[in-house]
């Protein structure tokens, strides 16, 4: 639980720090520095597991990794130029809730009790 709280604090402060760095450097450079630090940490694990992945799936994984991490971080930090850090964190925090609603209304997926409880909790927390 302690590591989850620590990860939440680091993640939630990243957009606030990103907004402050606009006066010092370009947002693309901020994203590159973040990803280089993450690459240094994850590279030993990556090299160990990479050979076990099927070759046809590797190209799909590269595209998924690019769009899921690089493009999303870049778009979030570029979006900070046009809005405040608090509204950006609010929009990003609502993403899990929107995924549940899109899945329910467009794809007719059924949610379990925990999902319903967490949606109600998010709606209640959003009111305050």
Curated annotation (Swiss-Prot):
Keywords in alphabetical order: Cell membrane, Membrane, Transmembrane, Transmembrane helix
Primary subcellular site in the record, as a coarse category: membrane
Residue span(s) of domain EamA: 9-110
Localization per Swiss-Prot or TrEMBL: Cell membrane
Listed InterPro entries: AA-Vitamin_Transporters (IPR050638), EamA_dom (IPR000620)
Keyword Acetylation tagged: no
Tree of life domain: Bacteria
Annotated membrane topology: Multi-pass membrane protein
Any one GO CC term of the record: plasma membrane
Transmembrane segments: 5-25, 27-47, 60-80, 87-107
Protein name (record): Uncharacterized protein HI_0976
Protein source organism: Haemophilus influenzae (strain ATCC 51907 / DSM 11121 / KW20 / Rd)
């Amino acid at each position: 639980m302690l590591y989850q709280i620590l990860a939440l604090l680091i993640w939630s402060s990243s957009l606030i720090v990103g907004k402050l760095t606009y006066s010092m450097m370009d947002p693309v450079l901020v994203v590159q520095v973040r990803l280089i630090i993450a690459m240094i940490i994850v590279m030993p694990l990556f090299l160990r597991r990479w050979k076990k992945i099927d070759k046809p799936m590797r190209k799909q994984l590269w595209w998924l990794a690019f769009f899921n991490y690089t493009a999303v971080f870049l778009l979030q930090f570029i979006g900070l130029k046009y809005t405040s850090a608090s509204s950006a964190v609010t929009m990003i925090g609502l993403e899990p809730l929107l995924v549940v609603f899109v899945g329910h209304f467009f794809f007719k997926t059924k949610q379990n009790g925990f999902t319903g409880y967490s949606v109600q909790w998010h709606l209640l927390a959003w009111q305050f």
